[in-house]
Amino acid sequence: AERSVAEPEIVLAESAHAAFHKGAHLFGLRTRMVPVTDDWTVDLDAMADAVGPNTALVVASAPQYPQGVVDPVAEIAELAAGVGASCHVDACMGGFVLPFASIEEPDAWGSPPWDLAVEGVTSISADLHKLGYAPKGASVILHRSRRLRRYQTFDFDGWLGGRYVTPNLQGTRSGLPMAAAWAVVRHLGMDGYRHLVRSAIGSADRIRTAVRAIDGITVPGDPRHHLLSIVSDTSSDEPIDVFALGDALAARGWHHDRQGPPDGLHLTVSAGNAVVLGEWLEDLVAAAVEARAAAPGSATDYATLE
């Protein structure tokens, strides 16, 4: 409203989470999607072409969900600031991983600046109920200033019931998830999160190494943290159908989200997976052998359908 933008737009990569499109639909915003490059981060040249006088928000992901790589946040924030737009960093998956990863293994697991230390970043989201290890229903959004935060609040005093103020779409919510999240964070502390992050990324590193050692499948891009995908290796003489691999793993009790394009199996690795990792790695090898001779598998939906 302050810039008098009549038809506001969100500029985001095709790798940005689908929830942004849901939000745009709810609020009547237009989305302008830009492609990713060969390393699966946003194409900055295409994003520069997409931002303009109607841009209200530019999105960066730290990391993006499908391939698990971190967008160049500083460059994205600079593009947003150049047109007077906000820049939101989706760190729902990385907010409780990236800070501790940089402490544990700065060379191997570190990331370029992505948080509010980056000039031009105006807000960050981080999910406590993911790698914060809190129960479902707890997340945070951090605004750079109180001035920006006030736009989130709905304030109405034009009915007979008195003033109604709410900072979210859901209205009144249970305090239980917040209390549980507070308890988890207090219990784990810095040392606890460092230990959990080391376990999660250590397991993910073993998975990446094992997948890339099997002819016919690979891990795309250079994900350094706990998210990754498994895809068919099209450079192989015998590429494996990745959904057939998913079927073979499912038959052994391992169920993975299926995504695309490109067709892939998505893995979110947490510290809790470490105890079964050895068994999973053995089954991966057996499933790959089975998938070579199998008919193509089928995709599923990342959603809840009626």
Positions of predicted regions on the chain:
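PLP-dependent aspartate aminotransferase-fold enzymes
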Residues: 1-57, 77-78
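Helix C-cap/helix->beta junction micro-motif
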Residues: 27, 82-83, 214
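Active-site phosphate-binding strand-loop segment of PLP-dependent enzymes
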Residues: 42-91
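Active-site pre-lysine segment of PLP-dependent enzymes
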Residues: 44-46, 70-82, 94-123
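Active-site C-terminal subdomain of aminotransferase-like
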Residues: 103, 107-226, 231-236, 305-306
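Non-catalytic terminal extensions of PLP-dependent enzymes
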Residues: 194-197, 204-206, 213-215, 231-306
